[in-house]
């Protein structure tokens, strides 16, 4: 199977988010890459589900709280940008202050 670099990157993000969701379910605090992957996948899946850009941004900004992440991680993530595939094409989604 031949994958483009973008497809490989998406697979890595989805794989990391799967691990991160499992760790979160076990009550572990997430590190920086885990937190970013969950926010990113939430935005990408919301877009794939047919939600609007605004709804995707709102949902992705509510998926994690400061209690879900290690100390200082929330301060390291002022925003997350992801190119998501919506029903009408791909768009850049910016999630501001994703961890509150």
Curated annotation (Swiss-Prot):
Gene3D superfamilies: Urease, gamma-like subunit (3.30.280.10)
Gene Ontology terms describing biological process: urea catabolic process
Protein location: Cytoplasm
Principal subcellular localisation of the protein: cytoplasm
GO molecular function terms listed in the Swiss-Prot or TrEMBL record: nickel cation binding; urease activity
Catalytic activity as recorded in UniProt: urea + 2 H2O + H(+) = hydrogencarbonate + 2 NH4(+)
Pfam families, sorted: Urease_gamma (PF00547)
InterPro entries, alphabetized: Urease_gamma, Urease_gamma/gamma-beta_su, Urease_gamma_sf, Urease_subunit
Domain of life: Bacteria
EC number: 3.5.1.5
Pathway listed: Nitrogen metabolism; urea degradation; CO(2) and NH(3) from urea (urease route): step 1/1
Enzyme class: hydrolase
UniProt family annotation: Belongs to the urease gamma subunit family.
Subunit-structure text: Heterotrimer of UreA (gamma), UreB (beta) and UreC (alpha) subunits. Three heterotrimers associate to form the active enzyme.
Name by which UniProt lists this protein: Urease subunit gamma
Natural source organism: Yersinia pestis
